[in-house]
């Protein structure tokens, strides 16, 4: 069984932004209060601030200066639109604050290069790219990197959009900043609408799903991206992951590999959750097994967190360590490369022509 997580100090962080994604950080702090606390949240709207204070029991401020004057957090989460993020990040850096920003950190390559210059000057800017830390993906990527599949040559990712999908693809392939030739296309198809951010559908309705499929040819490795804009909330469009190596492959939760040239073996990735049937431990994820081997342990058990929240909570833990002088684990350069390749993918889809990436400043 997974070992209990060691006692850790409470991580106190601030938030700039009051949108939908900000609520993920607030839910984490509410679910695991011994590990996380929000020192305050910045929103320009006094009405929004009052509503958040009532719902979440937090303090809100109109400016970052007011937030920082009230209490010095370990770091500040920036959760604002990508067009506004670079200015907000730069302002916090000027105030000597470490920043964990949502994805993407900027809208354009120029934005990314501007932020890269701040990092080179000593700014502590990390990016909350949570998908590789989500329990199932973390387990799958650990298997891919662990050697039993041999050298990885191909990955097909139908998991998440744009830069998120690119990050999972790059991680599965072991790709750093190598250049790629990108081809892409779009396809529209009808689908029955599922739930959305506002809840379940109230009637059956046919809507249009916009699907982007792309190939990233890195020479000796191939990444395939496939995602529909209706996929996140759809009950009838499941996520998929294929990772192929010379000695085996991962197909979603199924793993096959060779122990030697004449001995194949297979195992499934299985979730271990409490609170099912007659189990009275509460409802949380303990971890994931590959056969009988633990390959992922939930460090926030028994907190009642969704997989995405477990991943974001891990981003907070790693950011706290970096803000205190530890290594960078979610660097701006990696997120910049993800977004850069995603922008090129959309260019290839729009023009119908192959696009070749070139090395950017953050890669050096």
Question: Which stretches of residues belong to each language-model region?
Answer:
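Short acidic-hydrophobic, aromatic-tinged amphipathic segments that line or gate anion-handling sites
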Residues: 59-64
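N-terminal Rossmann-like dinucleotide-binding module
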Residues: 1-56
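Beta-strand-loop-alpha-helix segment that lines the small-molecule cofactor/substrate pocket
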Residues: 70, 75, 81-82, 86-132
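Short, conserved SAM-binding/catalytic segment
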Residues: 51-58, 114-119
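C-terminal helix-rich "cap/oligomerization" subdomain common to oxidoreductases
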Residues: 1-8, 75-77, 124, 300-364
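C-terminal glycine/acidic-rich active-site capping loop/insertion
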Residues: 205, 217, 231, 241-242, ...
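Rossmann-like dinucleotide-binding domain that binds NAD(P)(H)
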Residues: 151-238, 242, 363
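Rossmann-like NAD(P)H-binding beta-loop-alpha module
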Residues: 135-154, 165
């Amino acid at each position: 069984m997974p070992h209990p997580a060691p006692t850790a100090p409470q991580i106190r962080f601030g938030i700039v932004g009051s949108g939908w994604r900000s609520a993920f950080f607030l839910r984490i702090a509410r679910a695991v209060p011994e590990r996380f606390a929000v020192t305050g949240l910045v929103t320009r709207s006094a009405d929004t601030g009052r509503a958040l204070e009532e719902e979440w029991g937090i303090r809100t401020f109109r400016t970052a200066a007011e937030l920082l004057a009230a209490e010095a957090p370990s770091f500040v989460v920036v959760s604002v639109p990508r067009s506004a993020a670079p200015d907000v990040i730069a302002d916090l850096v000027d105030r000597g604050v470490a920043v964990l920003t949502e994805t993407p950190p900027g809208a354009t390559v120029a934005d990314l290069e501007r932020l890269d210059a701040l990092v080179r000057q000593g700014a502590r800017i990390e990016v909350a790219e949570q998908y590789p830390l989500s329990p199932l993906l973390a387990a799958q990527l650990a298997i891919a990197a662990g050697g039993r599949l041999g050298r990885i040559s191909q990955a097909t990712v139908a998991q998440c959009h744009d830069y998120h999908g690119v990050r999972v693809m790059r991680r599965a392939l072991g790709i750093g900043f190598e250049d790629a030739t990108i081809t892409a296309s779009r396809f529209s198809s009808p689908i029955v609408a599922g739930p959305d951010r506002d809840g379940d559908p109230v009637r059956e309705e046919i809507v249009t799903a916009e699907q982007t499929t792309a190939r990233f040819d890195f020479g000796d490795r191939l990444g395939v991206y496939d995602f529909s804009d209706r996929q996140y909330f759809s009950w009838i469009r499941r996520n998929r992951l294929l990772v192929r190596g010379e000695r085996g492959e991962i197909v979603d939760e199924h793993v096959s590999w060779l122990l030697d040239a004449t001995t194949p073996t297979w195992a499934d990735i299985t979730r271990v959750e409490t609170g099912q049937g007659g189990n009275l431990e509460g409802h949380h994820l303990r971890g994931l097994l590959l056969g009988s081997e633990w390959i992922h342990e939930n460090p926030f058990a028994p907190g009642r967190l969704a997989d995405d929240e477990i991943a974001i909570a891990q981003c907070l833990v790693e950011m706290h360590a970096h803000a205190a002088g530890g290594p960078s684990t979610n660097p701006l350069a990696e997120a910049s490369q993800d977004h850069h390749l995603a922008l090129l993918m959309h260019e290839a889809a729009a023009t119908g022509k192959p696009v070749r990436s070139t090395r950017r400043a953050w890669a050096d």
